[in-house]
Amino acid sequence: MAPSEKKLTEDKKNSSLNKKIETSNSSSEKSSENNNGDSQNNEAPKTFKELGVIDELCEACEKLGFKTPTPIQQEAIPVVLNKRDVIGLAQTGSGKTAAFALPVIQELWNNPSPFFAVVLAPTRELAYQISEQFEAIGGSIGVRSVVIVGGMDMVTQAVALSKKPHVLVCTPGRLMDHLENTKGFSLKNLKYLIMDEADRLLDMDFGPIIDKILKIIPHERRTLLFSATMTSKVEKLQRASLHQPVRVAVSSKFSTVDTLIQRYLFFPFKHKDTYLVYLVNELAGNSIIIFARTVNDTQRLAILLRTLGFSAIPLHGQLSQSNRLGALNKFKSGARSTLVATDVAARGLDIPLVDVVINYDIPTDSKAYIHRVGRTARAGRAGKSIALVTQYDLEPFLRIEATIGKKMQEYEIDKEGVFLLSERVGEAQREAIIQMKEIHDRRKSKGKLHTKRKRDDLDREEQIY
C-alpha cells in the first residue's frame, strides 16, 4: 500500500472522525436537488461547512484563502457529495476547480483507493494547475496527483502511474496512449471522471478520443462535466457520459462578471505600440496580461517592453512545454509583472491576482474577448480590462459591446504624455525587429520545423502560426 493510501486509511479508522464525515454527508443529502435534475438552493450557504464539507477540508480552504464558497461551489458541492452526476455551467473565473476538487477529495477521504479520479483537461497548462489545486486542498491528508500530458516522456509518466496515485489529471490524447500501451495500467476501479472546459475539449477535436476513453472506463462511476457554454457537442457528450445529471447553472448568459471594470482607448493604428507602452507605464506595480493575436506580435511586444525596462515575458503555443510552464510560474510568482500572450492564456489557467487585462488586438469572436478579460476579476475580486481600438477594430468592438450588453467608457489618458514616449518607443521597435530576426534565423538554422504529427499534437494549446 502506498504511504499516502495508508495515511488516508489510518485516518479513516478514527471513529470520531467517521462520525463527523457521516454528519457532513447526511447534511449534504438534505441540501441539493429535485427530481427534475435542477439544482435548488433557496438559501445559499455562507460557509464550506454548511455545504457538507468536513472540518479537515474546511481548514485547508481557510489556509488557501477560500473565505466563502463561490456560487458554483455553493451549487455543485452538495450535489456531488450526494453522489449525483453533475453538469456545471459557470462563467470564467467562478472557482469551479474547487467546486469539483473538494467533494471528490472528501469522497476519497471516505474510500481511499488508487486511480480514484481522472480529470480531463484541454491544455497542458490547465492540467498542471488542476493538479496543483488537488494537492493544495488534499495535501494535508496525503492526496497524490499526477499530471499525464503530451510533450513529456512516456516512460517517466509510466513510472509515475506505477506508484498508483489517487488522482490523474490528463489531456485525452496522452491518457489514451497509456491506456493502450502502458503495461499494467488500467482504470477498472475508477470512481470519478471529471471533464473540465468540456466545450473547449470538443472544440479541439478530442471528441473521438473521449468516446474511446468512455468505452474503456467503468460504467459504474460518477461523471462531472463543467463547461463555460452549452453547445450541441457538449449536449451530445452529456447524453453519452452522464447518468441522470443535476444541472447547476450559475450563469446561463455568456457575460462578464460585475466586479470587472471595462474601458477602451481609441486611436490611429500607427500609434498602437506607443499607447500600449503608455498604459503599461501608467499601470506600473500592477499584474498585467496583454493579449495579442499572433505568436509574432506576442514575442515582439515582450521584447519591446523589456527593451524599455518593463519585466515582460511571452506565452504562446510555439514555446516548449518547459518554457510555457516557466513563463507562467515567473508571472504567477511576481518575478515578471507583465505576461504577453496569445489566446493560449485566455481560458482555464488559474492565475491569481491579475489586476489588468489589456487587449492589444481586439478578437473577432466576442466569446474570446470574454474569456480573455475573465483572467482578472476572478472569484469575486475586482479587476480592470482595457481594449485598444483602432479604426480597423470598430466592427468587432461594437459586437463585443452588444454581446456583453454594456457600453464601455473611454479610459482617460494624458495624450501629451503618450506622444512624449514616441521617440523611445520607435527606438525600442527597431531593437525588437533586430532581435526578432535573430530569433527567426536561429530557428531556421536549428531546423526545428517538424512535419510528422502524432496524437500528442491534439494536446497543443493553439494553432502554430
Curated annotation (Swiss-Prot):
Notes concerning its domains: The Q motif is unique to and characteristic of the DEAD box family of RNA helicases and controls ATP binding and hydrolysis.
Keyword hit for Hydrolase: yes
Motif (Q motif): 46-74
Xref: CDD domains: DEADc_DDX47 (cd17954), SF2_C_DEAD (cd18787)
Bias type Basic residues, positions: 442-453
Subcellular location(s) of the protein: Nucleus
Binding residues annotated for ATP, in chain numbering: A90, Q91, T92, G93, S94, G95, K96, T97
Biased composition annotated in UniProt, kind: Basic and acidic residues: 1-22, 454-465
Name of encoding gene: rrp3
A Pfam family: Helicase_C
Subunit structure: Interacts with the SSU processome.
EC assignment: 3.6.4.13
GO cellular component: cytosol; nucleolus; nucleus
Comp. bias regions, Low complexity: 23-36
Lineage: Eukaryota, Fungi, Dikarya, Ascomycota, Taphrinomycotina
Highest taxon above the source species: Eukaryota
Provenance organism: Schizosaccharomyces pombe (strain 972 / ATCC 24843) (Fission yeast)
UniProt record similarity statement: Belongs to the DEAD box helicase family. DDX47/RRP3 subfamily.
Name of the protein: ATP-dependent rRNA helicase rrp3
Catalytic activity: ATP + H2O = ADP + phosphate + H(+)
